[in-house]
A protein has these predicted regions:
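Hydrophobic positions on the alpha1 helix immediately C-terminal to the Walker A/P-loop
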Residues: 30, 34
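The conserved Walker
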Residues: 23
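ATP-dependent small-molecule kinase phosphotransfer cores
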Residues: 51-111, 118
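Short beta-strand-centered segment that lines the nucleotide-binding/catalytic pocket of NTP-utilizing
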Residues: 38-56
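NTP-dependent small-molecule kinase module
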Residues: 3-4, 178-216
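Conserved lysine of the Walker
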Residues: 27
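Hydrophobic anchor at the beta1->P-loop junction of P-loop NTPases
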Residues: 19
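A glycine- and Lys/Arg-enriched "phosphate-lid" helix/loop adjacent to the NTP-binding pocket
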Residues: 131-179
Length: 216
């Protein structure tokens, strides 16, 4: 993304509200409720990951294509959480240009709510003309644990496809905890809005707090 295009992109994306944050922080729920309430369109970055993988190449998304070539144990069991963090393609911003391509192709009226962990602070900030158009939800480890357990714990989805689901779960939780720490540091350094999400946070509370940031 060329810095020469930043002012133009800010203007083209001024109708967008951005909700980033750690995994399992409530981004999807909040974005869906606000989009319905405000009559906005909704763009969930999780929903387009497979499409973006198809539209990418090993040259522009090398980490993604290495990940695709791994088996489930190589992805989630055999590597240290820090290595998993540093080599996870979406955490490193691969494919973010495809998100922007998608957003530019969508109608600008009446507004667009965009959510997902792929919205990295340093990539989003240059696109936001007003600081109240972006917020990151930061889950505590306890909140993340509760969310994962509610989804089935070690038996949840891809974890159950490994030879050691318990270890895969521990690795995933540690990787995601560290990713949230990275988001916390980066948003603080860039002066961006964040909301801490813990086990006392209700869905309605979280929606209201995001509305305050967005001034809706």
């Amino acid at each position: 993304m060329s810095t020469r295009n930043i002012p133009t992109l800010q203007e083209q994306l001024q109708h967008v509200y951005w909700i980033g944050g750690g995994s399992g922080a409530g981004k999807s729920t909040v974005a869906r409720r606000l989009a319905t309430q405000q009559g906005f369109s909704l763009y969930a970055t999780d929903d387009v990951m497979a499409d973006h993988a198809r539209r990418s190449s090993p040259d522009d998304c090398p980490l993604l294509h290495r990940f695709i070539a791994m088996d489930m144990d190589e992805r989630w069991v055999k590597r240290a959480p820090q290595t998993m963090l540093e080599t996870f393609h979406w955490f490193q911003g691969e494919g973010f240009n495809l998100i922007i391509e998608d957003l530019l192709s969508l109608p600008r009226e009446p507004g667009l709510m965009v959510e997902g962990f792929r919205l990295l602070p340093h990539l989003v900030k240059p696109l936001v003309a007003k600081p109240n158009r972006a917020v990151w939800l930061l889950p505590t480890p306890g909140f993340r644990q509760v969310v994962v357990e509610s989804r089935g714990g070690a038996a949840w989805g891809f974890l159950g496809k490994t030879t050691d689901p318990e270890r895969a779960l521990r690795n995933l939780l540690e990787r995601d905890r560290t990713f949230t720490d990275v988001l916390r540091e980066e948003t603080a350094r860039l002066g961006l809005h964040t909301i801490e999400v813990d086990t006392t946070t209700t869905e309605n509370d979280l929606v209201q707090r995001v509305m305050v940031v967005f001034q809706l």
